[in-house]
């Protein structure tokens, strides 16, 4: 039976609720594998695992339970090894890397902050800040709305100003977070967001981070800020080759089997 890996932490094994289950239908019981002072949180791997909502939530729930009181290196959803022995071998082979990253994550949690513009507020802002745009808009109004070409030209200028403001406000958000963050990771670009930042912060400093985000939302009302956390530090595992090596070794072992 293949082994599904949720995350890695130090011994002793974290206290897990009785009957904790993970992925699969029916859900597989979660167990621990220990090697060289490290613990892998695992279960049997289902044969037909798909990234359905229930499975993703089960993966996250195991990590949430395990990381309540200590750092855990979270594996990405779908990390499967050939068997328990292969997981143990990876723990032994990469022990130094895992310990180094666990040290870096000690007492820390991740928050994800996404920012977008309130369209009405940002349009008001760029018009107020740009005399040329105001003059063009007023000229169009005085001419009964302006010609099609004039409207198109104004629209293009406004779009350029809004795009420039997106860059400015993305930098503004990062500057607000940097003094409070141990590390910042930029997430993938996605439509609708001008910034997608993950922040590694001391657990005790989380209130300060949230207060700074709230203050920014007040001082920059054109920003719509969405905060998610605390989360397992997914975004900061990949900065070390530790978790990547574990997953790659597991995948190679599975392919070889």
What are these regions (language model features)?
Residues 1-257:
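An interfacial alpha-helical scaffold signature
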């Amino acid at each position: 039976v293949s082994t599904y890996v949720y995350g890695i932490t130090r011994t002793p094994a974290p206290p897990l609720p009785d009957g904790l289950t993970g992925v699969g239908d029916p859900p597989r019981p979660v167990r621990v594998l220990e090697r060289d002072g490290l613990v892998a949180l695992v279960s049997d791997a289902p044969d037909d695992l798909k990234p359905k909502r229930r499975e993703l939530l089960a993966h996250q729930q195991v990590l949430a339970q395990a990381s309540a009181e200590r750092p855990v290196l979270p594996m990405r959803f779908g990390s499967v090894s050939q068997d328990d022995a292969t997981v143990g071998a990876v723990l032994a082979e990469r022990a130094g890397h895992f310990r180094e990253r666990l040290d870096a994550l000690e007492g820390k949690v991740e928050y994800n902050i996404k920012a977008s513009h309130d369209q009405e507020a940002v349009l008001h802002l760029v018009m107020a800040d740009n005399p040329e745009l105001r003059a063009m808009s007023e000229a169009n109004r005085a001419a009964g709305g302006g010609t099609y070409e004039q409207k198109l030209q104004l629209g293009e200028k406004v779009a350029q100003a809004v795009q420039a403001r997106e860059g400015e406000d993305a930098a503004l958000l990062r500057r607000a977070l940097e003094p409070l963050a141990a590390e910042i990771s930029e997430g993938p670009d996605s439509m609708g967001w001008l910034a997608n930042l993950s922040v590694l912060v001391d657990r005790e400093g989380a209130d300060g981070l949230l207060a700074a985000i709230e203050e920014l939302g007040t001082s920059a009302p054109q920003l719509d800020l969405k905060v998610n956390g605390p989360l397992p530090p997914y975004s900061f595992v990949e900065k070390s080759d530790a978790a990547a090596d574990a997953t790659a070794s597991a995948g190679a072992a599975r392919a070889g089997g």
